[in-house]
């Protein structure tokens, strides 16, 4: 296993805010790679510390436990996703345009090989490790990074553009309509990642079905 040294500051003093952020990101990259490669239960703090080139006590001091480190990785992914999604949602656009943009992004990100491996890890280990992701989902109110979409749908309902009785449920249904089928087949090894043209077709069809049930 190769070791990824986390660089120290040149001055020997406290790291700058940017240096600290860079070091944390490198550490999280190492941890994410090991979790995806070996699985949650088989990954140890010892192996993570060794590959990252840091002391094990540093990991425990920063994250508290392996579960805390994994939760930090999930939260970092969620924050990045939410930031990307917020940049895509333009409330002045028509619902069809906004939803197709979101659907395409869901398919582009959600069918990436590394994301499929993450889903597989969660499916395999979540029931073996109680609380592995339950607290994360509870903290996010069940939306798990889809808050910008929920906010948009709620605004569209208020504007009289869509008719939805339960926005959080509709948000979840939209995600599964877009991503659920192909992701399940990929997880089972029954399908390869669709190419860009196929992803665009899936996005358009999912949006048409969704709007057929809620457009005014």
Q: Predicted regions span which residues?
A:
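Basic, helix-initiating cap at the start of DNA-binding domains
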Residues: 1-38, 42-54, 61-62, 67-68, ...
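C-terminal peripheral helix-coil segments that are non-catalytic and often amphipathic
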Residues: 1-14, 101, 105, 147, ...
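Short helix-capping/turn signature of helix-turn-helix
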Residues: 40, 63, 123-129, 139-142
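Amphipathic alpha-helical linker/stalk segments
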Residues: 71-102, 110, 114, 154-155
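Amphipathic alpha-helical packing segments from all-alpha helical-bundle domains
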Residues: 97, 117, 121, 131-158, ...
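Amphipathic alpha-helical segments used for helix-helix packing
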Residues: 110-137, 182-188
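Membrane-interface starts of transmembrane alpha-helices
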Residues: 163, 167-171
């Amino acid at each position: 296993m190769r070791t990824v040294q986390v660089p120290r500051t040149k001055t020997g003093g406290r790291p700058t805010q940017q240096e600290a952020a860079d070091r944390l990101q490198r550490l999280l990259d190492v941890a994410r790679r090991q979790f995806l490669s070996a699985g949650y239960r088989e990954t140890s703090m010892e192996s993570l510390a060794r590959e990252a080139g840091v002391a094990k006590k540093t990991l425990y001091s920063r994250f508290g436990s392996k579960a805390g480190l994994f939760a930090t990785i999930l939260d970092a992914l969620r924050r990045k996703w939410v930031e990307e999604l917020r940049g895509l949602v333009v409330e002045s656009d028509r619902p069809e345009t906004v939803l197709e943009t979101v659907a395409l992004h869901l398919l582009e990100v959600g069918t990436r090989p590394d994301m499929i491996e993450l889903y597989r890890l969660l499916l395999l280990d979540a029931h073996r490790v109680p609380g592995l992701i339950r607290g994360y989902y509870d903290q996010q109110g069940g939306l798990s990074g889809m808050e910008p979409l929920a906010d948009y749908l709620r605004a569209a309902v208020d504007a009289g553009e869509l008719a939805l009785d339960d926005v959080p449920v509709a948000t979840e249904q939209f995600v599964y309509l877009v991503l659920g089928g192909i992701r399940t087949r990929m997880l089972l090894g029954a399908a390869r990642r669709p190419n860009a043209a196929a992803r665009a077709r899936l996005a358009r069809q999912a949006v048409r079905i969704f709007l057929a049930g809620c457009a005014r």
